């Protein structure tokens, strides 16, 4: 009888071990790290994804000599439509009601009615058929913000309120909701995360350095609302028009 009991115990131990391994594999947290180049869809070292508000757009930024540049089409689409490239004269122009501000491609200076100013960086340049403009130069005439990180550039053009929460415990920010999803970055206890979307057990969040991923709800403290501070550095000029109290005749008077 003893050998039979021993055999049964061995079977139970083996079965329990196998079951434990299955449960461990199913519920343990993955330590796999996500590929940032793949996540941000950047294949060249001088390119960075653009996060506009809370979404990654298809356009990308160019990082050259530690300066962030956007192509002119991106500037027109998301930031400011007034910039104009004169490809014949090799000029980047910006017009307001009182003056035309100009800079030559490849130069660090720009000219206004007050004279020539040096920006300290190449303001614009051309590669192929594409005109690139320095993000800081765009900011001289546009109310928006940007911050450069390792593989991405965070851009804000609109402001309102946002939901935030502090982490109650160190945790991994994952590519998707789920313990097996690859890790994008690590967040520490006390870090403030922006809550983009809350689900049953996971929330889509944004870290202070604008990494968007997922954390478990049980790691989050109380959710509160914050009012964002808009950028108002640039005072847009007033576009005035002529008015008259009397009727204006646009025709030509004929002699009587």
Regions picked out by a protein language model, each given a short descriptive name:
Residues 206-219:
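Short, compositionally biased
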Residues 200-204:
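Short aromatic-glycine-enriched beta-strand elements
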Residues 2-199, 218-254:
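Primary recognition of N-terminal secretory signal peptides and signal-anchoring hydrophobic helices
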């Amino acid at each position: 009888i003893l050998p039979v009991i021993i055999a049964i115990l061995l079977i139970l131990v083996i079965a329990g071990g196998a079951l434990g391994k299955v449960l461990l594999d199913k519920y343990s947290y993955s330590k796999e790290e996500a590929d940032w180049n793949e996540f941000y869809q950047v294949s060249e070292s001088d390119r960075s994804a653009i996060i506009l508000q809370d979404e990654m757009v298809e356009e990308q930024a160019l990082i050259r000599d530690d300066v962030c540049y956007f192509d002119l089409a991106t500037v027109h689409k998301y930031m400011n439509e007034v910039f104009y490239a004169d490809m014949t004269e090799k000029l980047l122009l910006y017009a307001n009601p009182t003056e035309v501000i100009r800079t030559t491609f490849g130069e660090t200076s720009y000219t206004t009615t007050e004279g020539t100013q040096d920006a300290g960086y190449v303001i614009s340049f051309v590669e192929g058929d594409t005109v690139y403009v320095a993000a800081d130069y765009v900011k001289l005439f546009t109310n928006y913000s940007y911050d450069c990180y390792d593989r991405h550039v965070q851009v804000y053009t609109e402001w309102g309120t946002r939901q935030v929460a502090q982490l109650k415990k160190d945790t991994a920010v994952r590519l998707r909701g789920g313990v097996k999803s690859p890790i994008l970055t690590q967040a520490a206890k006390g870090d403030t995360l922006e809550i983009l979307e809350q689900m049953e057990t996971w929330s889509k969040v944004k870290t202070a350095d604008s990494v968007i991923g997922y954390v478990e709800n049980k790691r989050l403290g109380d959710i509160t609302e914050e009012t964002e501070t808009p950028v108002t550095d640039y005072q847009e000029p007033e576009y005035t028009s002529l008015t008259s109290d009397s009727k204006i005749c646009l025709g030509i008077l004929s002699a009587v």
